[in-house]
Swiss-Prot record:
This is Colipase. The gene is CLPS. It is found in: Secreted. The keyword Lipid metabolism applies. It comes from Myocastor coypus (Coypu). Forms a 1:1 stoichiometric complex with pancreatic lipase.
């Protein structure tokens, strides 16, 4: 038990001693491998194929392809930037398979 406690304390000491503000698990920059969008500074963890590695990426800009926010936290197309909405077809199957795609639009410019 004492060895386990010493190992945990040593691990914590090494983690806190690292001067780099970039995280190893959270606060990841674009291009770094991720498992969930919560790990990324941009809040988007994107992959190109079901078997591809996911990497942090920028959120979708106006008139770009997008995915609505999902509970999965990994996207084929990133959700829209703040203030934009992802307009597109939505279906139950698309929600399950994470393939509901749309275009980022500014809700203020719609009439």
């Amino acid at each position: 038990m004492e060895k386990v406690l010493a190992l945990v304390l040593l691990t914590l000491a090494v983690a806190y001693a690292a001067p780099d503000p970039r995280g190893l698990i959270i606060n990841l920059d674009n291009g770094e491998l991720c498992l969930n969008s919560a790990q990324c500074k941009s809040q988007c963890c994107q992959h190109d194929s079901p078997l591809g590695l996911a990497r942090c990426a920028d959120k979708a800009r106006e008139n770009s392809g997008c995915s609505p926010q999902t509970i999965y936290g990994i996207y084929y197309l990133c959700p829209c930037e703040r203030g934009l909405t992802c307009d597109g077809d939505k279906s139950i199957i698309g929600a399950i398979t994470n393939t509901n795609y749309g275009i980022c639009q500014d809700p203020q410019s719609k009439k």
